[in-house]
Every structure is written in C-alpha cells, then in structure tokens.
C-alpha cells in the first residue's frame, strides 16, 4: 500500500486546482475543490512551473482554474510516491487549454508541454500512449534535461513537424531522420547541441512570452 504524504495543496500560483474526474462530464470543464497530496518537493516545482506559465500568458486574461486527475494515488509508481501530477486542463479568462484537444490545438499544447519539460524531469503527453491522451503526466523522478527517450523524442518530433515543417514520424525513436532534422533546426536557432531543458524548450519557436503568445522569433 502506498503511503499518502501528509503534505497537500489546493491551489498553485494562487489559482485553485480542481479535481475534474468525479463525473465524466466534468473533464476539462469544471471540478471540485480537492486536497492534492504529494511531496513538498513536487509542490514546490509545480508552484514555480505555474508561476512561469501565468507570467507568460498575461494576454490570456486572469487564470481561473487548473483541472487535474490527481497527484498521489494508492498504486505503484511515481503517483504512489507522491511525486507525480496529472494536468487535464487550464482555464484563463479568454483561453482554455484541454489536454485531449492536442490534435486540433497543437501550438498551445506544445508550448505548455515545452514549459513542462523546462521544469519537470519526466513529461508524458498525448503521443506517449492512448492512456495519456487526456492528460499531461509530469513527475520529478528524473533530473531535468534532454534524453534520447521516447517521451522526449516524441515532443521533439512534434515540435519539429509543427514549427519547422518537418515530416517526421512521431514514433519516439531517436533515429537518423530525427537527428538530421534536429541538427538542421539547431543550426537555425544557433544552438550547438541540446543538453539542457532550456535548449529543449528553445526548439519550439512557439513561445509563451510575457504578455503575449507568439509562434515566431526567439525570446
């Protein structure tokens, strides 16, 4: 049996976090106040992540709610250790992000996923497998940085396709085609190599900037 951490949060960056899985029709729309138990380390990282996100999305209006499938869960793995969080949706005054809408809103999805990669060591998104279509799983089981693993490679392939016109298969395999496309993009951006989370974030030119949302240029 996984031991529930005593630590919990009900808001992040001053925004209420709601549990949206009590009823099927709540998903991505609304939720109930909830105590999200997790380690204090995870809470601290999530706090910084959402502060960063909301500072970059002033043009979206005031953030109103964060919707989640949960943090600590009584099961094996990072959730059972209180080190993982599932992000379903974020509501601002003028914009709504819902994880399940990735196929039709890739620009926004990838921008948020890029920021997740900047702050959290493991990010499992829509392309990872069908079980992750409806949420972004983030956890602190690994240090932040670039790794040639399927979850990071899938993000990389989607970003290269979406923002640089590549036609890579999003299969999570870091092969010759992906490496060639990556090197060409790094040359355009003036980045010698991808070794840090910041460099990984910069691959996506679709940026969440302070006060605006743009898909061109560098910050």
Labelled PLM ranges:
Residues 51, 55-76, 108-125:
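Conserved short secondary-structure elements within globular domains
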Residues 1-66:
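Active-site acidic/histidine clusters and adjacent loop/turn architecture
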Residues 218-219:
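Extracytoplasmic low-complexity/disordered linkers and repeat tracts associated with LysM-containing
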Residues 2-18, 25, 40, 79-85, ...:
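Catalytic cores and adjacent binding grooves of peptidoglycan-active enzymes
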């Amino acid at each position: 049996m996984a031991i529930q951490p005593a630590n919990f949060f009900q808001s992040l960056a001053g925004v209420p976090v709601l549990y949206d899985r009590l009823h099927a029709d709540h998903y991505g729309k609304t939720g109930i106040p909830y105590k999200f138990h997790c380690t204090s380390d995870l809470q601290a990282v999530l706090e910084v992540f959402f502060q960063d996100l909301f500072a970059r999305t002033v043009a979206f209006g005031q953030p109103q709610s964060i919707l989640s499938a949960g943090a600590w869960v009584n099961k094996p793995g990072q959730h059972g250790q209180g080190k993982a969080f599932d992000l379903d949706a974020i509501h601002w005054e003028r914009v709504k992000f819902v994880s399940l809408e990735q196929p039709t809103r890739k620009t926004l999805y990838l921008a948020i996923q890029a920021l997740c990669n900047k702050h959290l060591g493991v990010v499992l998104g829509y392309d990872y497998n069908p079980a992750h279509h409806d949420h972004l799983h983030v956890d602190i089981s690994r240090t932040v940085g670039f790794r040639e693993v399927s979850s990071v490679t899938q993000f990389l392939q989607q970003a290269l396709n979406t923002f640089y016109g590549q036609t890579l298969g999003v299969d999570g395999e870091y092969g010759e085609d992906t490496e060639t496309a990556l090197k060409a993009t790094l040359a355009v951006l003036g980045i010698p190599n991808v070794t840090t989370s910041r460099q990984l974030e910069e691959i996506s030119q679709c940026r969440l900037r302070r006060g605006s949302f743009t898909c061109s240029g560098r910050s």
